[in-house]
Design a protein with these regions (language model features):
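N-terminal domain-start signal
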Residues: 1-227
Length: 227
């Protein structure tokens, strides 16, 4: 009965949050908008993002700031769900956190490999990652080369797959991205079997399998177009 009550509480929480998500039809409407101002007005009127957008100064309404606010909203939702979970469900939440970590590492790789003059813009993510992640943003932002970036991940699970790629010849950003994607899906595929029970596992594997298929299509397209 305890597990049933625990899950029912989470389901109630998630359904309440889901009810505030944008629908497919609303995304179609958004795609027809022509400016950031129109987008913000639409989100303020039609979505849960009103909570984080309504107080933004008009001078701050440009793409970079909007993306930051929406990402922080995502992290806020993760935090709300995580706090509501029991220990077993938190193990599942850690699998989701890995996706955020991969995105962070890929962002940093683009900065150092492409030698962007723009510095790392990650301070707004620090509080969230300090609380839930094995990655130290404070260490990552000191990197100026791929060697330094990989070494700054030495205390994490991502060090081994990245070092293996780093030590090969003529490595590209594409190679790093592919290595991280492969590691992410193979590791979470194994871990999910330890965490989830049969019905939950089947649902998660179906979802994860679809994402792997889409990723394969994406990589095939990129390989044909650029190589």
């Amino acid at each position: 009965m305890g597990n049933l009550l625990e899950y029912s509480g989470i389901i109630t929480k998630l359904r309440a949050m889901e009810a505030r998500l944008l629908t497919d039809e609303q995304f179609e409407e958004i795609s027809a908008l022509t400016s950031i101002t129109e987008l913000v007005s639409y989100l303020n009127a039609n979505s849960s993002y009103q909570d984080v957008l309504q107080d933004m100064d008009e001078t701050m309404l440009h793409r970079g700031n909007i993306e930051k606010v929406l990402i922080l909203s995502l992290y806020h939702d993760y935090t709300k769900i995580y706090r509501f979970c029991g220990q077993s469900q938190r193990e599942f939440m850690k699998l989701i956190m890995k996706g955020y970590e991969i995105e962070l590492i890929n962002y940093c790789l683009r900065i150092v490999i492409n030698h962007y003059k723009k510095p790392f813009d990650l301070n707004y993510k620090s509080a969230f990652f300090d609380r839930y992640s094995q990655i130290s943003i404070g260490k990552l932002i000191t990197a100026r080369t791929t060697d330094e970036l990989v070494e700054n991940l030495k205390e994490t699970e991502y060090y081994a797959p990245l070092k293996k790629i780093k030590d090969t010849d003529n490595v590209t950003l594409y190679d790093y991205n592919l290595a991280l994607d492969l590691y992410y899906y193979t590791s979470t595929w194994k871990e999910q079997k330890k965490i989830l029970k049969k019905s939950d596992l089947e649902l998660f594997m179906r979802d994860r399998g679809s994402k792997i298929d889409l990723l394969n299509i994406q990589w095939i397209y990129r390989a044909k177009k650029y190589y």
